[in-house]
Regions:
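Conserved, well-structured ligand/cofactor-binding cores
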Residues: 1-458
């Protein structure tokens, strides 16, 4: 491998000749051999740095045109566009497990954009610190990258995936109207419900989760950029924070604003905790929905068997013909991971000692993983399972008419205690509710038929 010599304030460093990064990135690359090649800084953060560095250059060009000249801005903008496109991903090698402020990743972006920008310009006009990091600090850029990544993840990935699943459930509701089945509470038989009503509960849960995510978004759209090192805005020109937020909004198509209190923006990550709480709520509901589906599909002969789901692959290496609810299992595992991520995020967010939180990389690492897993799990579950759910009407009817909880319909006619006696007697003797009620003398057979209509109990 060929190398070139780069230098920083600590001296010279050998850097791979074919990479755009420079001395500080290389030091981090050598000093933090933790999860190398596996737990790299999320690409969502790399993209966000491309956005914010371009936005900062635009704002600096407007406020300090003698330093961020039009020529420099053009080179920086093109380099940032390449970062956002993913064309320069190989030049962002750093792992999550580095400094808690994300300083090395900020410098990684500065160095790559400067070197690529100089290549675009055909001459050395850009310096990583003096130009790309102008009016900024790692302490306000990394929180800003977190905000951008979180907003884009929720708006462009999670919510569309939620909407897709909601649409599928709406169709299933319509397709299954009028199909009455046994309800269940505590994993025990309960009074009847229509399959459409049951599905509507799933759909409404996702609609509520979407609302919670939307409630979280405005706080995520407040940017720390402009606070610089400790929130005072040292070395940033007046109005930089407002202009850079406007530029970020223009680049992303999302409405970002500058945080009203930069001291809070640097040290607190409460908006991330709150937003991830909404993701955790979504995970909890997906866990419930996936569990309902696999319970209802259990069998095929010895389980509930009230619905059928698509058969996507063989389920066992030893039991021929076995098919498992694999999509449900994937969703439930994702839910467990997201709930675990929430614990890590909450703990890390509590570590904002004095003017800066220094657990930011692990916070956004877990946040972006949750976004990615939830959105992809919902898409997979929808495509490979939910759209293919069908009701086993015969099994639903069989289970319904064998449910002892239908006795609840007799309460107005024979009273709660007599209804309970009827159910217990039927269970003990393995006879029908009608036979039990008549045997105990509570109703005649004719009166029982007159008042007992399970399909009207919904």
């Amino acid at each position: 491998m060929e190398y070139r010599i780069e230098h920083d304030s600590m001296g010279e460093v050998k850097v791979p000749a074919d990479k755009y990064w420079a001395a500080q990135t290389e030091r981090s690359h050598e000093n933090f051999l933790i999860g190398v090649g596996i737990e790299t800084m999320p690409r969502e953060i790399t993209y966000a740095f491309g956005v914010l560095k371009k936005a900062a250059a635009i704002a600096n060009n407007q406020l300090k045109p003698e330093k961020m000249t039009d020529e420099k801005l053009a080179a920086v903008s093109q380099a940032c566009d390449e970062v956002m496109s993913g064309a320069l991903n190989e030049h962002f090698p750093l792992v999550v497990w580095q400094t808690g402020s994300g300083t090395q990743s900020n410098m990684n972006a500065n160095e790559v954009i400067a070197n690529r920008g100089n290549e675009i310009a055909g001459k050395k006009i850009l310096h990583p610190n003096d130009d790309i990091n102008m009016s900024q600090s790692s302490n306000d850029t990394f929180p800003t990258a977190m905000s951008i990544a979180a907003v884009l993840g929720i708006e462009d990935k999670v919510i569309p995936a939620v909407d897709t699943l909601i649409s599928t459930f709406k169709k299933l509701e319509k397709d299954n109207e009028g199909i009455v089945k046994s309800g269940r509470t505590h994993l025990q038989d309960a009074t009847p419900i229509t399959f459409s009503q049951e599905i509507s509960g799933w759909r409404a849960s996702l609609e509520k989760d979407k609302k919670l995510l939307e409630i979280a978004l405005p706080e995520l759209k407040e940017l720390a950029l402009g606070g610089t090192a400790v929130g005072t805005g040292l070395n940033a020109p007046k109005g930089f924070d407002v202009k850079v937020a406007e530029a970020v909004s223009e680049i992303t198509g999302k409405q970002f604003i500058t945080a009203p209190n930069k001291f809070h923006a640097l040290t607190s990550k409460d908006e991330i905790v709150f937003a991830h709480g909404a993701l955790k709520a979504l995970a909890a509901d997906l866990m419930k929905i996936a569990n309902d589906v696999r319970w209802l599909a259990s069998g095929p002969r010895l389980g509930l068997g009230e619905i059928k789901i698509p058969e996507n692959e063989p389920g066992s290496s030893i039991m021929p013909g076995k098919v498992n609810p694999t999509q449900c299992e994937a969703v439930t595992m994702v839910a467990v991971q997201v709930i675990g991520n929430d614990t890590a995020i909450g703990m890390a967010a509590s570590q904002g000692n004095f003017e800066l939180n220094v657990f930011m990389p692990v916070i956004i690492y877990n946040f972006t993983q949750s976004v990615r897993l939830l959105s992809e799990a919902m898409i997979s579950f929808n495509k490979n399972c939910a759209v293919g759910i069908t009701a086993n009407k015969e099994k639903m009817s069989h289970n319904l008419h064998n449910s002892l909880m239908l006795v609840t319909a007799l309460n107005p006619y024979i009273g709660y205690e007599n209804a309970a006696k009827t159910a217990k007697n039927a269970y003990k003797k393995n006879i029908s509710l009608k036979e039990s009620c008549v045997e105990l003398g509570f109703l005649t057979a004719e009166k029982f038929d007159e008042v007992f209509h399970p399909e009207q109990m919904v």
